[in-house]
Design a protein with these regions (language model features):
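N-terminal, polar/charged subdomain of small-to-medium soluble alpha/beta proteins
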Residues: 1-118
């Protein structure tokens, strides 16, 4: 398995449990590490890997239309989407919600999911 990564992707979505968080889209910083088959490296063919520009563009668009209470639920949504739509075999999703707590630079969540596990 090879890995591609997209780190520091900025996106916005409606997320949070407090009313003031739900008044506007909240900024997020997302890191994705995506496990892909070695075929792309062997064939030098973008058709055999995850097209990261497509992942970024599509994910940003989808998140603007979604609604989550918890970062954990958002991370699970992203992991399921990457595994289901892009032929990935493994994914690590890290989401940071910057500046949400006074005196704390960032809070967030990180999950890993494997396509072969339930």
């Amino acid at each position: 398995m090879d890995k591609i990564f997209l780190h520091g992707m900025r996106a916005e979505t409606l997320i949070g449990v407090y009313g003031w968080e739900r008044e506007h889209l909240q900024p997020l910083i997302i890191d994705l590490d995506i496990g892909v088959p070695e075929k792309a490296a062997e064939d030098d063919d973008i058709g055999n890997t995850v097209h990261y520009a497509e992942v970024c563009e599509t994910l940003r668009r989808q998140l603007k239309e979604q609604d989550f209470l918890l970062l954990e639920a958002l991370a699970e949504y992203i992991a399921d989407w990457v595994l289901g739509c892009f032929g990935a075999v493994w994914v690590r999703v890290k989401i940071v919600k910057p500046g949400i707590l006074p005196g704390v630079r960032e809070v967030g969540v990180e999950i890993e999911r494997d396509k072969d596990k339930d």
